[in-house]
């Protein structure tokens, strides 16, 4: 079903690392990170919820959430959160501790900020701490157009196996913070480049704004924004676009092994321009019609690989060499058939 990856291969390296501290908000590029069972440090450890229902809110339905910008400040040990003003066009920055509330509250298990009914994707209710000053809560609520709260994930273990309808690898029981399905998402720069190269032709053929999607316009923006796809680890040096579809196990650096579990079926979040918070109808579906490649994902296009660390802790940095230890063979007609494709 899989084989040791022995073909001649250029050296693959970690090109970029990204964390998204607040679910559905803007990401931050970093040079290195420790990781735990829930993924890179501070990745999706906070989320914004409706103040009444405690249901999580997402840029899938509120695209402008991507303009809320949390930044990890190691010097002050704070998460600095810049919130745009819905009326003035300006923005204000507020801070919450990076430290988990359980480490600084006098009685964390009985603190009034702790609640147990926060809802993420129909899972069993999750525990979490309501955090942030009244000023931050007010700014977020005004921007979101409803009463909201900022929540830090509690200590209760959230397993992938608890997420309804999500596949999980036999023998692996990944846990995660407030991410949707898995603690890590891996993508390759080669695949992004190939996708970017398609856009001008597809835009012209399908009647989209050719000026907006011309090669020069895309280049002036630094290329298609990888943040649309919200990966944590972007690798360079992969020989063929979407070769990562066939990966099963990789090693990053000397001994940090990562299980590459499943293709990531994309919702409409990649259609949101991270610079403007406005949805683009061209992406992802119009450009990626040939990326309906996972039988278990139905008609959804796929980009990136849902993954999980094998170790409970470790570290990753930009420039780390990535070694593919196990991979599925490429089929004669192109593409890869993974275990989940064979059994479903």
Kindly give the residue locations of the regions a language model identified.
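Metal-cofactor-dependent catalytic cores
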Residues: 1-344
């Amino acid at each position: 079903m899989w084989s040791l990856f022995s073909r001649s291969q250029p050296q693959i390296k970690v090109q970029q690392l990204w964390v998204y501290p607040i679910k559905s908000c803007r990401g931050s590029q970093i040079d290195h990170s420790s990781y735990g069972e829930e993924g890179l440090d501070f990745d999706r450890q906070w989320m914004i919820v409706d103040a009444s229902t405690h249901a999580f809110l997402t840029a899938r339905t509120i695209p402008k959430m991507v303009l809320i910008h949390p930044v990890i400040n190691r010097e002050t040990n704070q998460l600095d959160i810049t919130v745009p003003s819905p009326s003035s066009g300006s923005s204000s920055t507020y801070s919450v501790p990076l430290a988990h509330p359980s480490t600084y509250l006098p009685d964390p298990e009985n603190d009034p900020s702790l609640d147990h009914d926060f809802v993420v994707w129909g899972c069993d209710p999750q525990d979490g701490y309501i955090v942030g000053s009244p000023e931050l809560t007010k700014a977020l609520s005004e921007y979101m157009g409803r009463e909201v709260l900022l929540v830090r994930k509690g200590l209760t273990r959230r397993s992938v196996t608890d997420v309804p309808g999500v596949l999980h690898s036999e023998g692996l029981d990944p846990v995660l913070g407030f991410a949707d399905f898995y603690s890590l998402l891996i993508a390759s720069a080669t695949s992004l480049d190939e996708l970017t190269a398609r856009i001008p032709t597809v835009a012209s053929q399908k009647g989209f704004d050719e000026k907006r999607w011309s090669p020069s316009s895309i280049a002036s923006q630094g290329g298609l924004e990888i943040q649309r796809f919200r990966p944590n680890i972007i690798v360079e040096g992969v020989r063929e676009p979407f070769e990562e579809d066939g990966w099963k196990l990789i090693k990053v650096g000397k001994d940090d092994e990562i299980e590459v579990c499943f293709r990531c079926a994309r919702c409409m979040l990649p259609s949101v321009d991270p610079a403007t918070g406005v949805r683009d109808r061209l992406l992802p579906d119009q450009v990626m019609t040939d990326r309906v490649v996972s039988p278990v994902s139905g008609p959804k296009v796929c980009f990136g690989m849902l993954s999980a660390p094998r170790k409970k802790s470790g570290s990753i940095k930009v420039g780390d060499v990535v070694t593919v230890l196990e991979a599925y063979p490429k089929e004669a007609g192109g593409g890869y058939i993974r275990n989940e494709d064979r059994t479903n």
